[in-house]
């Protein structure tokens, strides 16, 4: 479809049919708008047995057209396996360790709508799922258990085994959710940079993350760690938030630790001397919060593999702490439930 303008109404009708269908699809926010992926010809469920083969396959792939790509997610546990870190026995919820899809249709929503598809005929099964909250939210850990883990980690910090560590807690409930409606409602109220939605037959994910963990542009790689959060109020603005972060010893030290770790992670895959701070300790404003951010970049070593980039950069320091390896080991000793897509 070479002329998006002449097909605009038709494309909008197509999107409505897609949204109301039961087709698996992914929506991903980009700088200029949104990309939608669907008509998946392949679905790879990641396991300990196939993760290396999957990542290595990209080194032999030639990219001739827009649909020559995979889109999906890595779970926390599969990234630990990739790093060779053992996870103690935990309670599991049966969720996937990671899933990647090969799309045959990509829809770009910009000022106009463009469709790139290898499919000649589109078929839709009409389907609509209303959103209903069926039970109240519950926390997955009791206060005394959380305090016990907190005290153990406090001791580890005093002993110098870790400098910063992030305990994971989950809220859960039973709901019937239309993930597409839910995603677009979030985008109206809080369109964060790393927002996406996955809808498949047996699961959905809706994410609205402000943090850019990993962005590759040509041979340049960028990360924007967030360490520092302030709730918005009528008395706070960008200037007062920046002043708060700069004058707060705790926030500054935590931020510096994460930035140092991310710079070190980048240096593993970048040309020596190219890792630099592009913008240091600035504030990003969202609907309910201010975040303390630093932007870091580097030039990738020639022929650096995707697998090595992922091993170096994931999981991000803002969700685990630092230093990376020892902190992951400590978390895995104490957390009794899988993080999955955390």
Where are these regions (language model features)?
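Extended alpha-helical targeting/anchoring segments
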Residues: 1-342
């Amino acid at each position: 479809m070479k002329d998006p303008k002449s097909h605009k109404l038709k494309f909008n009708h197509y999107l409505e049919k897609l949204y109301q269908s039961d087709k698996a699809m992914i929506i991903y926010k980009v700088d200029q708008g949104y990309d939608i992926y669907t008509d998946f010809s392949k679905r790879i469920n990641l396991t300990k047995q196939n993760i290396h083969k999957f990542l290595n396959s990209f080194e032999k792939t030639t990219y001739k057209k827009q649909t020559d790509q995979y889109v999906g997610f890595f779970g926390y546990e599969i990234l630990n396996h990739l790093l060779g870190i053992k996870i103690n026995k935990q309670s599991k919820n049966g969720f996937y360790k990671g899933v990647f899809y090969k799309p045959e249709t990509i829809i770009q929503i910009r000022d106009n709508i463009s469709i790139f598809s290898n499919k000649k005929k589109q078929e839709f099964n009409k389907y609509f799922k209303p959103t209903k909250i069926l039970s109240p939210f519950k926390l997955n850990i009791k206060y005394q258990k959380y305090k016990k883990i907190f005290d153990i980690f406090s001791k580890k910090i005093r002993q110098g085994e870790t400098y910063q560590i992030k305990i994971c807690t989950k809220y859960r409930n039973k709901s019937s959710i239309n993930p597409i409606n839910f995603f677009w409602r979030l985008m109206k109220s809080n369109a964060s940079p790393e927002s996406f939605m996955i809808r498949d037959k047996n699961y959905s994910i809706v994410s609205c993350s402000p943090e850019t963990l990993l962005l590759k542009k040509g041979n340049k790689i960028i990360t924007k760690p967030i360490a520092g959060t302030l709730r918005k109020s009528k008395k706070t603005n960008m200037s007062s938030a920046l002043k708060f972060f700069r004058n707060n010893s705790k926030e500054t030290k935590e931020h510096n630790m994460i930035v140092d770790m991310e710079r070190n992670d980048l240096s593993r895959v970048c040309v020596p001397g190219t890792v630099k701070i592009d913008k240091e300790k600035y504030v990003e404003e969202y609907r309910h919060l201010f975040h303390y951010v630093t932007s870091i970049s580097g030039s990738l070593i020639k022929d650096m593999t995707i697998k090595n980039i992922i091993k170096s950069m994931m999981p991000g320091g803002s969700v685990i702490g630092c230093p990376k390896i020892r902190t992951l080991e400590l978390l895995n000793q104490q957390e009794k439930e899988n993080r999955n897509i955390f």
